[in-house]
């Protein structure tokens, strides 16, 4: 992979589309630094690591789709190729599941905007129409849009769905699935309660 800047000519060579994309990222960084007059330079490089990843935990701290896309833009700029999207955990369920709308009606919303309030405040979840509701979730179409956006940037999205541990948000809305049959306890899914 190389970027060759000569008088009146810029050449980017790479074995594949991702390599060309990364070469253009390098060119953009040079242009940002040097303005319209990029000095003659030859850059030959390749990634040191095949897996160059970043994890965003939206379960604990929800961020909207546009924020996620801005993060992807930054990852692409620095040639990251994996985006680990932590979508569910005890702190919130962030994916629309049409068969189970109660997951996003309740488990996507907390009555506290900050982590400490949620973690130590007692009440864990609330309905989205609660005046104190803070949180959110991604519709299936928004998830598809983010995945396609990432693909265009040569970034693979790795969704993380915490199961069966770290699933307090699921057990809050489906307590019958826990071994105790009660929500808000440190309990995992009970294999016998399907």
Listing of model-derived features with the role each one plays in the protein:
Residues 91-152, 167-194:
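Aromatic- and acidic-residue-enriched carbohydrate-binding clefts of CAZyme catalytic domains
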Residues 16, 75, 157:
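Conserved hydrophobic/aromatic pocket- or pore-lining residues that grip, position, or stack substrates
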Residues 10-14, 57-61, 132-134:
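Second-shell loop/turn segments in exported
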Residues 57-90:
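A conserved hydrophobic secondary-structure block that centers on an alpha-helix together
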Residues 71, 146, 157:
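Aromatic/hydrophobic pocket-lining residues that form π-stacking "cages" and hydrophobic walls in ligand
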Residues 20, 68, 139, 143:
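Aromatic/hydrophobic pocket-lining residues that form the small-molecule binding cavity
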Residues 1-51:
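Contiguous, structured surface segment used for ligand recognition
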Residues 52-56, 83-85, 157-161:
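Hydrophobic faces of well-ordered beta-strands that scaffold small-molecule active sites
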């Amino acid at each position: 992979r190389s970027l060759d800047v000569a008088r009146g000519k810029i050449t980017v060579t790479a074995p594949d589309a991702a390599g060309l994309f990364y070469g253009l990222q390098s060119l953009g960084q040079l242009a940002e630094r040097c303005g319209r007059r990029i000095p003659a330079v030859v850059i030959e490089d390749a990634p040191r690591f095949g897996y160059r990843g970043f994890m965003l935990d939206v379960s604990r701290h929800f961020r909207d789709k546009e924020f996620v896309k801005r993060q992807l833009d930054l990852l692409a700029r620095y040639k990251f190729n994996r985006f680990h999207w932590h979508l569910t955990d005890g702190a919130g369920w962030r994916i629309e599941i049409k068969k189970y709308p109660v997951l996003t009606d309740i488990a996507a919303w907390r009555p506290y905007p900050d982590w400490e309030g949620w973690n130590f405040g007692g009440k864990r979840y609330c309905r989205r129409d609660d005046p104190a509701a803070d949180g959110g979730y991604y519709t299936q179409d928004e998830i598809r849009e983010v995945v396609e956006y990432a693909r265009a940037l040569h970034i693979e999205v790795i969704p993380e769905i915490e199961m069966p541990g770290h699933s307090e948000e699921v057990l809050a809305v489906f307590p019958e699935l826990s071994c105790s049959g009660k929500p808000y306890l440190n309990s995992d899914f009970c294999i016998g309660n399907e």
